[in-house]
Amino acid sequence: DVRQFYATAGNEQWGEVLFGKDFGLFGRSNILLDELLSGYGQVSDTLGLVDGGGVSFGNIGTGYPYPFPTSQITYRSPKMNGLRIAAGVMDPVDTTEDTDSDIDKAYQEAPRFETEVTYEFELGGTQFYTWINGMQQSSDNTDSSIEKVDSKGLGYGVQAKMGNLSLTASGFQAEGINPFFTNNAGEALLREVDSDGYLLQGSYRFGKNRVALSYGKTKDDGNGLGSAADYETRGIALFHSINDNLTLVAELNQFEIEGRDTPTLDEETRTFAVGAALSF
């Protein structure tokens, strides 16, 4: 499955229009500025990510949901003294599908709407990148006994770079969403309950090396695993650049799930990973 397959049209005066498949806008800067994005991140037996059951998650689910690539038409304004605005019409997501019934069908009467506003500026020799993003959609069902789900979310954050030091803080608040994937992977039957999270990170570059510290947490009232739970990831990573294309990585992280209503969800997983990141 191709994550990104799109075309763009635009110019410096009026901006750019993207049409095709790309990452969503809600949570976009949250994940793209994750210090562990090119590392390993968390794994979980509960989430089916151990022993080849899936890929490692970075900080997905512990600080932000994954802005899953989706078909869209998105407009991005030109940069206006550091300010840029993006707004998109996205393929909506089934959040009201009852897999226990053969007669119901989730449907949406309107597309999913997402937006992101970013602002870059310099203050006292420090480079700042700030953002706020959001989404809204509604999903209904042909079975009138299944309640309509109105989903909405807000993401935000700031990154400050001072020489070789980088500090990033981000977070999100949402209702009626899957706290792991914005496309509600697996099409779970969601409810209009809350989820929120934050991610705090710092990194320092010295020579060809970069060390990063990370702590992320998501509190979910039950849309993730069907029962309220808190999810946390603590991590430290060392990156060593061989050249512009190859980076060696060593990472240690700890992932925890704490069920609020039942201890059966409780999990603690520690992972040490080494590897290489190749880009071209």
Where are these regions (language model features)?
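Detector for outer-membrane/organellar transmembrane beta-barrel domains
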Residues: 115-236
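Outer-membrane beta-barrel "beta-signal"
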Residues: 240, 268-280
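Outer-membrane beta-barrel proteins
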Residues: 28-31, 85, 94-99, 139-143, ...
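Outer-membrane beta-barrel architecture
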Residues: 16, 82-84, 125-131, 164-166, ...
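Residues that define the transmembrane beta-barrel architecture of outer-membrane proteins
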Residues: 1-3, 67-71, 109-113, 150-154, ...
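Outer membrane beta-barrel
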Residues: 1-95, 109-111, 118-122, 160, ...
